[in-house]
Amino acid sequence: MPRFLLTCWSFTGHLFHGINIGRALRERGHEVAFYSAPKTASLFAEEGFTFFPFEKVDEEAMSDIMFAPNRERSVRDTLQFTRTLQTYLLDTIPQQVEDLAPILADWKPDVLVDDGTIVGPFLVMWEKYNIPVATLDYFCCLVPGPEAPPFGLALPPPRNWHTRLLARSVAMGTRLVTASIRRRASEIRRSYGLPPLTTSINEFSGRVPLHLVLNTPELDYNQRGLPATVRYAGPCCLWNRPSYEQSADWLQQVPRDKPWVHATEGTAHVSAPIVLRAAAQGLANLPMEVILTGGKREPSALDLGPLAANIHAVRWVSHVDLLPLLDVMITTGGAANVKSALAVGVPLIIVPTEWDKPEIARRVEESGAGLRLAPRHCTPRRMREAVERVLHTPSYRQNAQRIAGIFAKYGGSATAAKLLEELALKHATVIS
């Protein structure tokens, strides 16, 4: 049976997506290994996967990019964000290749899967080592298509003359701003004897043998004019209960006679807890039960102030246990959180903070399954108004339930595993 090597950073959402796909591949009888940060070794051992740790890649440097307060992680400062993006995507490619080359030689995977941001596999190794590569997009398809605006600014989809003109203008500006990224990527490719890029990195990623989008077209502007290599598999993020996390039995003590609202900033949020504070203050003493989670931060360290009786604050709770009980979820817009909520028909309020979260929020709002609340408007009063609007407007839940039905038809991890298996078998046939 084919062997699959999955690469991923140690960020929680990346790990959850990868483990879901790895489990589905293993259920089909395949061997699966992961390449990730050394600190994830125990997690993969617990799951029973072969594990190869980063050797040359500096995980601490990546943590600085993700979590250091002096880094720009949104497009508010375009030039600084471009520099951050170049560091994140490109500067570790030589170390990735140095780590992965001996694994390819010794473990001999049939397919190499990158997590969409470990880009060495599709920018270098696919052509250099003649191994089929699949790349992942966790929510938004990054391959440019006619039905979507340029990625990054959360623009409206180009459906009339005004939005089409806006999309074309921004696309031209984006090519200029990101020219340094393309030049750096071409320099790296030339150092491995490969030709320079003639397109953007995102467009080039659509040329790999398989570009998997872990979402559905219906939640991605119904894109149809994409390369044949792009396939939508549905969400693959519903595993999220490591054995070392505490039980959620305490949820049984929370009254069920009022709506349940959950607010989370995810596990990668390091800035001021604007969402949790607005929820704790704005929803206090209202006829609802509000469950706040701090991710990797203890609520007691977040300066949320005195908590009302209806506010329940904990560090973490498994979404497998919590989400089916919710009436509304408030989030900063991480891909796994958003898809997990919609998979069980829960409408959303998204306060998009950084990276791809504004793009995700725009897509959810377009679908009618939730609304956006800009971070600068995330006050207790506006949070209360947003929650009451979603609770008392049936269309939000109806659209969330509609999307849940669409998700169920795509298969998620099982579909992703099947497509990866087909890629491996096709490559084996070509070789033979």
Report each predicted region and the residues it spans.
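A donor-sugar binding/catalytic signature common to diverse glycosyltransferases
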Residues: 20-22, 315-362
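Conserved nucleotide-sugar donor-interacting segment of glycosyltransferase catalytic cores
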Residues: 89-164, 218-220
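Conserved nucleotide-sugar phosphate-binding/catalytic loop shared by glycosyltransferases and other
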Residues: 34-81, 161, 166
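C-terminal amphipathic helix plus adjacent low-complexity
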Residues: 107, 380-432
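Conserved nucleotide-sugar donor-binding subdomain of glycosyltransferases
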Residues: 67-121, 164, 168-202, 206-207
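Donor-nucleotide binding loops and adjacent catalytic segments primarily
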Residues: 215-328
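Active-site-proximal region of nucleotide-activated glycan assembly enzymes
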Residues: 133-221, 227-229
